């Protein structure tokens, strides 16, 4: 076999690999676009109706007064990805965890004994103030038709829930600050941070401040910088607003809130009641007008302007 023939075969193999790789990339992109189009929502749709198609058993537990909202995300460890959903509530809900700190799953039985030598055991308070919501990201699949033992559909991530409202607010602000710092650090190392200024001296100051802020975070931790410092650097270094980015991300693949939806049947009843009330009031006013004995007299009585000594007409 000649050298030229071997080179031609190798060139054909390289070309075939390029075509196969391009075709595989096209298929993967098409599959991803298909899954993305399935959850292409932005505050659209009635939450209970959407969950009814996914999990009819869970849809029966939804209450519109809770301000329910459903979010969808793509995830998984393999391709093509799976569609996950999670139910959020935007109104205050009173539950057992909010009213009492006890762990009711491990309450001891009642102990009654008159023997002082055998006192009851001291109640263990280690599990108190631990909140488990059982509301993680669940895959949209046929698993809800199976028993619960056949598959785990909930996430194993634990979230802390402190009894103090002030402490919960501080933790929420700290998490938001950590997200901003991680976002800024990732964009800094990827080279995506772009300064808004064009002056060389200003660019040097911005770059120096950004580098010093990231170094302070890496040396002293998150608590070594304030949130307003991170906001200042983000405002100077990037045209993309972090808060707008987070707000847009939360609205992506999200249904409408049940708090914004009104029942059509209830609206019809309200309209009919209002029309009946206003109709009766107008009818009563018209009847009282014609029942007045002076109505016809007042209709044809000439109206004159009375002059008094204090009048200023003609002066």
Swiss-Prot record:
Keyword entries, A-Z: Cytoplasm, Membrane, Mitochondrion, Mitochondrion outer membrane
Keyword Signal: no
Any GO BP: negative regulation of mitochondrial fission
Positions of disulphide bridges: none
Cell compartments where the protein resides: Cytoplasm, Cytosol; Mitochondrion outer membrane
GO cellular component: cytosol; mitochondrial outer membrane
Tissues in which the UniProt entry reports expression: Enriched in the pancreatic beta cell and the testis and is expressed at low levels in other tissues tested.
The protein's role, per its UniProt record: Acts as an inhibitor of mitochondrial fission. Interacts with MFF and prevents DNM1L recruitment to mitochondria, promoting a more fused mitochondrial network.
Summary of subunit composition and partner proteins: Can homodimerize. Interacts with MFF; the interaction inhibits MFF interaction with DNM1L.
Protein name, UniProt field: Protein MFI
Organism whose genome encodes this protein: Mus musculus
